[in-house]
Design a protein with these regions (language model features):
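Conserved NTP-donor binding/palm subdomain of two-metal-ion nucleotidyltransferases/polymerases, i.e.
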Residues: 1-231
Length: 231
């Protein structure tokens, strides 16, 4: 990490997890840069609590419905699952959402003792999001000084957590445009401004962590944008 990145995470840890760290001294120019980076962090939209794949989304609904009627129901475990799923959805759309990761870390530390992690791991396996959930936990370990035993669903630290997280610091709303199509005078349809390429490249970053969700997210965006032409 460079100087600005180190100071940013020092501030995020101090503000959200009560560490006593202090940022290294900065010039006025660098303070403005940190302020912009914090704005970028806050500007990344939160993800919805839904799966991009229709079959998996129905499975998510069933998991929640069944748990509410279970004898040993665990609302805390359901809530943690919802945080993880929202982060997955947001990640595929906009990159790693540090606000969502911080929410995950805060919940683990304040309510983690109430969570049934055996049940949670069964659910994330059913939803095919084991590795991308592990990626979320790896961000907490890599940047927020969490211990691996605080996050039972992390069985090894994902190496990609470092690079993908630093990339998210430079989020720009203009980089997250949906795929755009235009109809030529001859009636053919084509994408504009390289939006197809940008969306595909963004999706490919997470393909190894959640293949079904990643491809479903890309195809949903593709057909949603195409339908706008027809309208």
């Amino acid at each position: 990490m460079n100087f600005l990145q180190r100071n940013l995470f020092t501030k995020l840890r101090a503000d959200n997890f009560g560490t006593k760290e202090e940022m290294e001294p900065m010039t006025t120019f660098k303070k403005k840069k940190i302020a912009q980076m914090l704005k970028n962090v806050n500007d990344v939209p939160a993800g919805e609590v839904k799966m991009n794949n229709g079959f998996l989304n129905r499975r998510l609904s069933k998991i929640q419905e069944d748990e509410h009627h279970a004898i040993d129901t665990s609302i805390e475990t359901i809530y943690l699952l919802r945080i993880i799923v929202a982060n997955v959805n947001g990640m595929l759309a906009n990159g790693i959402n540090l606000r969502g990761i911080i929410q995950l870390g805060d919940y683990l530390r304040t309510r983690g003792d109430k969570v049934d992690f055996v049940k949670l791991e069964k659910w994330i396996a059913k939803l095919r999001i084991q590795r991308i959930a592990q990626l979320e936990g790896s961000v907490l370990i890599t940047f927020f000084d969490f211990e691996q035993d605080e996050i039972p669903f992390v069985h090894h630290i994902e190496r990609g957590a470092y690079k993908l997280t630093l990339r998210s610091l430079y989020y720009n709303i203009m980089d997250q445009q949906a795929i755009q199509f235009e109809q030529t005078s001859s009636g053919f349809v084509r994408t504009t401004g390289g939006t197809m390429r940008k969306n595909l490249r963004r999706s490919m970053r997470y393909l190894q962590y959640a293949p079904i969700e990643t491809m479903s997210n890309f195809m949903n965006n593709f057909f949603r944008s195409l339908s706008e032409i027809e309208e």
